[in-house]
Amino acid sequence: MTEAAASDIPPFRYTAALADEIERRWQDIWEREGTFHAPNPTGPLADPEHPRAGAEKLYVLDMFPYPSGAGLHVGHPLGYIGTDCFARYQRMAGRNVLHAMGFDAFGLPAEQYAVQTGTHPRTTTEANIARYKAQLRRLGLAHDERRSVATIDADFYRWTQWVFLQIYNAWYDREAKRARPIAELIAEFSGGVRRTPDGRPWRELTDVERRSVVDEYRLAYVSQAPVNWCPGLGTVLANEEVTADGRSERGNFPVFKRNLKQWMMRITAYGDRLLDDLDKLDWPEPIKLMQRNWIGRSIGAHIEFPTSAGDSSAVGEPRINVFTTRPDTIFGATYLVLAPEHALVDDLVPTAWPSGTRDAWTGGQASPRAAVAGYRKVAAAKTDMERQAETKEKTGVFIGAYATNPVTGAQIPIFIADYVLAGYGTGAIMAVPGQDERDWAFAEVFDLPIVRTVRPAEGFDGKAYTGEGPAINSAAPERGLNLDGLGVAEAKARTTAWLEASGHGSGAVTYRLRDWLFSRQRYWGEPFPIVYDETGAAIALPEDMLPVELPEVDDFSPRTFDPADAGSNPETPLSRRRDWVEVELDLGDGPKRYTRETNVMPQWAGSCWYELRYLDPTNADRFVDPDTERYWMGPRGEGDCGGTDLYVGGAEHAVLHLLYARFWHKVLYDLGHVSSFEPFRKLFNQGYIQAYAYTDARGAYVPAEEVVERSGAYYLGDVEVSREYGKMGKSLRNVVTPDEMCAAYGADTFRVYEMSMGPLEVSRPWETRAVVGSFRFLQRVWRAIVDERSGASRVVDAPADEATRRLLHRIVDGVRGDMEAMRFNTSVAKLIELTNALTRLPATPREVAEPLVLMVAPFAPHVAEELWRRMGHPTSLAYADFPVADPDLLVAESVTYPVQVNGKVRGRVQVPADASEEVVRAAALDAVATALEGREPRKVIVVPGRMVSVVR
């Protein structure tokens, strides 16, 4: 800018420099005065003098961020600004608003950075948190900073460990349909109310046997389970952390199925409630559908198939339990298939092939054990998606054992095959090739019998028939079951009744949902409050020993292996701190030596309950005070689920964080620790801010800010480049940060731009060049109040003219409706309309200026505070009353009708708002008389308040 041009700028214009000064000053004032502190009903955060003490409460919650080293780009704060606008509006509307921000700071990225650099993950994470706090403060977010938490702080994860212990020391009573303390289960066993699994009295069981019985009921338990082992990362991954092609989401390493001892959470016990209570939530339907599908409730029957037990008489005769949604097809079950990892396989495999075993069944091996071992090795290298692909050729091996079909009495061979997954159902299926396409394909490969049990529809010429029809080939009168001629529903019911009566099975509900893998072989996570005694039994530490703090270690990394080494075993970083692992404790029966659990909790642990800690963050005696929880999150009335009033975050958390948090919250509810049975009453998914990236002829990304558009093409200098649309990222060289925008225009402009880009729930492209439009809007708001030349107020106490007053109240009415519905973009559009009208006036009437500033405040709070102060108000507008429209001024005095002749607008007519249809018709015909050329119109249609259509 030239000196002459600079001198032309009025001295009191709203500029980026002035915005910076105003914003920093008001941020300091808010912090110093505790402007956004929300009072609790009791305790140290109570404040009976607060302007909203005793008011209707509102709890607004953001999904708290993981503080990465890259800091925020302009896409990250979209939801935070949206919730801030909503919270500011609600505060001005008279509510006591709790809005806080914390940090989800444990996790793999910080640990991997520590491994690469040798810097302790706490050092980098705390530095990242400090940077995030500075960036968020610069945006003017109205958080109650007293309530900020970080999951890595011992004062926080002490309570994460406490919640874990509540879950560990609880069991799910299926009759009562709720969790109960484990002590009540033990009392039922010891009092004879509940039978032990083998029928022996409780008093006859040893301590080890009693522990074993109780552990089978616990909601948190250790299990030898098929898990996703990633040698390249040296850790076990949850299903959700594995990509569809069977690789780790982090690092892109191959992942293998292995049986390993891990901590699990019995989330499946809550399958029905997690599913049914979705109907009580105000959530987007796509998110509900994703959870319903993830839980995957299926109604059918468990059927037990007796077997011979390999060569081991000690095992007895184990039964293979299968779950099927079609028990009516049992007459067509001609073989069984087990997942290669199924726990019974090793018990069933004999040393030699039975007489008459077909060569095609053996996998080319000399013995069943060799065949099983070889097949397992091949299956372990495949992803679940590869194993279940419909197009792949079916493979498997006979394990050398047979089962008995309980209804036909036939001996049917048992195979293992990779298309059956250990983690789904029971890990075993009864194969009915006549009614299942995959079973048909397998039967064809291995030349197995095919029996149809449902009559195909007329004209059917396919293979497996999966449709409806009467039962056929389904009679065993000697066993008391005849299904022939019955429809599917009746046949299913009759079969289930027979199974239960004969002791061969029972009706059942199963879920696609699996128990939650809850341990990680990492360093940077919450330690478990668990030790092991000399027998290897897990023992929960008492609450007065919490927190179990994460110790310092020299090497943060788990031992990693060749990414292809599926047979490797986990070795955790904590296991190398022997002075921490091996500990002497007095747990009530004198000092003894114990071994600490060396796995850590997954990154999801802290986020499962953090919304509760915001309520009472300084409480050293409870994770949350009951009265405080009831005030902020309690049910509103009969049947209400309770929870936060608004939760805003990305849809990508639909089946991870959101499901896990619901599970933890329901356990806490069952045990009486919270009054709400859902954590998040209303969920809103914000869209994403995306960006254009540009590549040169080599495919290399070039700086997006240096690219210019000419004649529909894009150039870096004189070189044409290609444009693509998607994410922002450092590697894409298209990152724009909030810091840059605040420096160039101010935080208020950045906030207004993000809220005006489109509906909050819709993704949209970032356009740096368009930000100036929001800046100019705020300049016009400033000019409506402040004289740019003198700095004097342009606000006058003279009344507004009728048109301006009516416009104001129409805008107020529209903005209030938009703010309640979080339609922020249309709110901004209305404010622009009002501001543009004011700039045409010689001075701004106070009765319009003050409502304008109050309505601008949620979006541009700093400049609004400054203008409010300049208009003579000594206190912050944060608790000023949001404008309310006068209903009398919302009634239009006149209406303008466009008049169409044969579909084209030929004129307009203004008539009184209460004009009759005859008056409107006459005025419209008069207005288009020239277009009618003296002819009588064939038809005149008056759409009240909208338009007039004339057909000539």
From Swiss-Prot:
This protein's record includes keyword Cytoplasm: yes
PROSITE patterns for the chain: AA_TRNA_LIGASE_I
GO terms for cellular component: cytosol
Binding site for ATP: 730
Compartmental location: Cytoplasm
Record flagged with keyword Transmembrane helix: no
GO biological process: leucyl-tRNA aminoacylation
Gene3D superfamilies reported in the protein's UniProt record: HUPs, Isoleucyl-tRNA Synthetase, Domain 1, Valyl/Leucyl/Isoleucyl-tRNA synthetase, editing domain
A Pfam family of this chain: tRNA-synt_1_2
Keywords, ordered alphabetically: Aminoacyl-tRNA synthetase, ATP-binding, Cytoplasm, Ligase, Nucleotide-binding, Protein biosynthesis
Motif ('HIGH' region): 65-76
GO molecular function: aminoacyl-tRNA deacylase activity; ATP binding; leucine-tRNA ligase activity
Disulfide bridge positions per record: none
Motif extent ('KMSKS' region): 727-731
Known EC number: 6.1.1.4
Enzyme class per UniProt: ligase
InterPro entries linked to this entry: aa-tRNA-synth_I_CS, G2_nidogen/fibulin_G2F, Leu-tRNA-ligase, Leu_tRNA-synth_edit, M/V/L/I-tRNA-synth_anticd-bd, Methionyl/Leucyl_tRNA_Synth, Rossmann-like_a/b/a_fold, tRNAsynth_Ia_anticodon-bd
Classification via PANTHER family: LEUCINE--TRNA LIGASE, MITOCHONDRIAL, LEUCYL-TRNA SYNTHETASE
Matches recorded under NCBIfam families: leuS_bact
Family of the protein in this entry: Belongs to the class-I aminoacyl-tRNA synthetase family.
Name this polypeptide is given: Leucine--tRNA ligase
Native organism taxonomy: Bacteria, Bacillati, Actinomycetota, Actinomycetes, Micromonosporales
Gene: leuS
